[in-house]
From Swiss-Prot:
Belongs to the ABC transporter superfamily. Arabinose importer (TC 3.A.1.2.2) family. It comes from Burkholderia ambifaria (strain ATCC BAA-244 / DSM 16087 / CCUG 44356 / LMG 19182 / AMMD) (Burkholderia cepacia (strain AMMD)). GO terms for molecular function: ABC-type L-arabinose transporter activity; ATP binding; ATP hydrolysis activity. Residues 5-240, 251-497 form the ABC transporter domain. It catalyses: L-arabinose(out) + ATP + H2O = L-arabinose(in) + ADP + phosphate + H(+). GO terms for cellular component: plasma membrane. This is Arabinose import ATP-binding protein AraG 1. It comes from the Bacteria.
Amino acid sequence: MSAALRFDNIGKVFPGVRALDGISFDVHAGEVHGLMGENGAGKSTLLKILGGEYQPDAGSVLVDGQPVHFSSAAASIAAGIAVIHQELQYVPDLTVAENLLLGRLPNALGWVKKGEAKRHVRERLTAMGVDLDPDAKLGRLSIAQRQMVEICKALMRNARVIALDEPTSSLSHRETEVLFKLVDDLRAQGRALIYISHRMDEIYRLCDACTIFRDGRKIASHESLADVPREQLVAEMVGREISDIYHYAPRALGDVRFSAEGVDGPALREPASFSVRAGEIVGFFGLVGAGRSELMRLVYGADRRRAGELTLDGKRIDVKRTGDAIRHGIVLCPEDRKEEGIIAMASVAENINISCRRHSLRAGLFIDRKTEIETADRFIQRLKIKTPNRRQKIRFLSGGNQQKAILSRWLAEPDLKVVILDEPTRGIDVGAKHEIYDVIYRLAERGCAIVMVSSELPEVLGVSDRIVVMREGRIAGELARAQANEHAVLSLALPQTSVAEAA
């Protein structure tokens, strides 16, 4: 049986980096083919070739046995290919319906038939089991909702080959189950799917076959995962065995370093209070929409607080904007690193130095380039940031390496006291997670107070000294590490269970 999609000896080179080297594998109709590898292994680059964003320097792509060359994304779409990237592509000021039908809006004599467009979109969303308002502006939706729109857009094009790059990274459990059903339905319809994920549970739940990348090369292809243990996939991905990804070790904790009392804002149902000791890692867990990120933005000054007091080392501080927080040694690594974390057109070195630049000014006026170069090189080496050089534009780095650069930005701060990490390992492979946990522990050992927001319950349980659980815009409860387990945390997080019952 000929493959619906074949990659034949694909090669791609960027300045100083061989991103893909001799990649060959097949994807068949009615098959979900998993693609795994560390960040920077070349998975997303391959999808960009499939989607017409990049052209291969060697090899060829075959669809239904015929060689194809996509000079643009439009050419790929016209050939029945749909690629859903980790970096979402949407127009924030347009509605859900307008984004889904962009370029295909029904019209009469040049006038868009909005009623027909909304009706069509509503019918398709209902059929897919997706609960979204067709009139809602994309820019006002959550990241999870925007991701569902991207997935729906591909499905509405009736593509024969669909590639999904970390599609559940921002989805709730219910939304993930909706996606899984869609994938199962598409497989049953005979479509060919590529599914990139770092989550082993998803790979084993969805995929019929799996290919492993490492450093731009194919390490292995498995036609069936039935007899392949998870440990083997991890070893193939990272080139080494990782027995305990979290490697938690108790550490001495100091006095309360930071506290928030009665913090309130539009996204919260009731005022929230919490504290963090010096050297402590407090994990914040909750379902999508629980208000964790919103609470952190209020504390950091990114959004305006209606009420609440912040205390640092026993003294009340006034934080009305992010600059105030940074001056007090409080920093936040945001959930959406593409929009709020990195400066995409700047170099790796500039992204690392942007926050601490005020410390490298000579005579208060001139940037000390020598100091900045030394700082960038030190953190590139210490955090193992994969980049050809410090001058490389950060947008060309993988998600894991971008995240390491953002963490380097704050590690370079000499007066760092409080670090808020919002989904620090989202979309990052198991090897990079291991390294980022090392960074978090290093910050805690420096005496920093760490707040880690995460949707991955095993991560929260594995890394945190204490866990705060949020539910529907309020703090539902708190658990010490010794008391915490999946049942106890989920009992507090799930809407149908009261705090009293969970206790």
